[in-house]
Each structure stands twice: as C-alpha cells, then as structure tokens.
Amino acid sequence: MKQIPMTVRGADKLREELDYLKGVRRPKIISDIADAREHGDLKENAEYHAAREQQGFCEGRIQEIEAKLSNAQVIDITKMPNNGRVIFGATVRVLNLNTEEEQNYRIVGDDEADFKQNLISVNSPIARGLIGKEVDDVVVIHTPGGEVEYEILSVEYV
C-alpha cells in the first residue's frame, strides 16, 4: 500500500481515538448488546439492533484507523533541516496579493486537514503550489475559486 504522510500530532490524535474506541467505546457497546439480549426476542428488539449497528460502525472505524497508522509515514517537522523551503508540516505565512490579507497555513496529511483551523492537506491546490518555494517567492495558485497570487512571508518548522 501507498504510504500516507502524517504529522506526529496527526498520528497521536489517531492513536488517541483508537485507544478510546478499543478501551471505552467497544466495551460499552458489548455491554449494551448483552443488556439488550436480556430483554428477550431479538427479532423485534430495537435496542439490540441499534447496539449491533453501533458495533459495526465502531469496528469499521477501528479497522480504518489501524490501516491508516500501519501505512503512515510519520514526519517530525522539528527534525527536518531548516532550509527555508516550504515542506510537508511547515507553517507558512502568506500574503494574498489579490486581497492584501495575510494568512497562515500548516501543511498536513489528508486526515488532519481542517481549513477552519488553517490546516491544509498536502494534496490541496494551495499546498501543492507552496511546496518547494521559499520566503519572498510569489506563486500563482489555481484554486476552485480562481487564480490566487500569494507572496510567501515566512516559513516555520514547528
């Protein structure tokens, strides 16, 4: 399988979720199934069927997280050489030359991306346009909303 780039923080969040699902959620669902079984006829037992459905969702998510972690290429940005170039995991401050607004973006893996928190996927048009560039470079990025011109103001490796 293809390796998935992921920050240390992203891998830690997935491990936390996996621990919660295995240590808290799964045992609770098993208990709910056992309680529902005690109510008799399983054919018309809505509690039983709901708990079994939750069990399916939980087990599916556990498998999904385990697969992602087994294929993850965890990249610790703090151990990367600081050469001033935009790379995976870097935090980039840019100036949108169309609107004169400054914006900070952190380039992360697909599963970590959250545009509202300025975490952009390494596969997003903005990240693809910025990767490999340096401070003071001006880049034109083709986004779904049209072309945007950015000047790179700073690159941090935190």
From Swiss-Prot:
Belongs to the GreA/GreB family. InterPro entries: GreA/GreB_C_sf, TF_GreA/GreB_CS, Tscrpt_elong_fac_GreA, Tscrpt_elong_fac_GreA/B, Tscrpt_elong_fac_GreA/B_C, Tscrpt_elong_fac_GreA/B_fam, Tscrpt_elong_fac_GreA/B_N, Tscrpt_elong_fac_GreA/B_N_sf. This is Transcription elongation factor GreA. Pfam families: GreA_GreB (PF01272), GreA_GreB_N (PF03449). One of its GO terms (biological process) is regulation of DNA-templated transcription elongation. Keywords: DNA-binding, Transcription, Transcription regulation. GO terms for molecular function: DNA binding; RNA polymerase binding. It comes from Yersinia pestis. PROSITE patterns: GREAB_1, GREAB_2. HAMAP family: GreA_GreB (MF_00105).
